[in-house]
Amino acid sequence: MSAIPIVKLKTSQIEAAGTILARAFSEDSFFSYVLPDPDTRFPALEYYSRSYVYASCLAGGVYGTLDPVTGIAVWGVPGSPVTLEHRNRSGLDRLPESFGTGAYQRYKHMVDFFESLIGRDVPTPHWYLSILGVDPDHQGKGLGGALLQPALAQADEDGLPCYLETLEEKNLGFYVRHGFEVLVDDR
């Protein structure tokens, strides 16, 4: 297979990226827990994905495939966090209204748990792989691995570790193949 071109996501690609992530995560354990109603999950997930990708683009940590966008990697970049201004500009500040009270409380509970691991089990500074999603029609073709490469290469150059969390046991083999190790198994 030839090399898959991966680029910094452009703001013109955010809408497509949000739809792809919503498709990729519509059956994910995290979002099925947060948004248990399958009839409302996709639109809420699409809003969240677009807003989160936009905020992360403003912070400089989103990579994607060239047009058409078929995969996205959202990274937390050391020294370039998503700020309150990014959240406000992107619409993330309206997430409680988009999700509804119960779903937003479940979301915050999960995020707070994951954030509690940083510093305790996760060294800082680090690169944080927040979201890696590939359109279901394009999975299994090497896009996920290609999407990881720019940030992994930069982290290696900077001598910094990378961190992610997954609730999907089926994803562990993929991440291990790309150099990640399990630090915490909190099943």
Report residues per predicted region.
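Active-site rim helix/loop that mediates acceptor-substrate recognition in acyltransferases
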Residues: P38-G61
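Conserved acyl-donor/pantetheine-binding loop and adjacent beta-alpha core of acyl/acetyltransferases
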Residues: I72-G133, Q139
